């Protein structure tokens, strides 16, 4: 959970 897309919470992008 470092600002990526995990679960159903994509805050920034795929995996930043």
Curated annotation (Swiss-Prot):
This is CAPA-Pyrokinin. Keywords: Amidation, Neuropeptide, Secreted. It comes from Austrophasma gansbaaiense. GO terms for biological process: neuropeptide signaling pathway. InterPro entries: Pyrokinin_CS. Its main location: secreted. The lineage of its organism: Eukaryota, Metazoa, Ecdysozoa, Arthropoda, Hexapoda. GO terms for molecular function: neuropeptide hormone activity. It comes from the Eukaryota.
């Amino acid at each position: 959970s470092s600002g990526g897309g995990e679960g159903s919470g994509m805050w920034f992008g795929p995996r930043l």
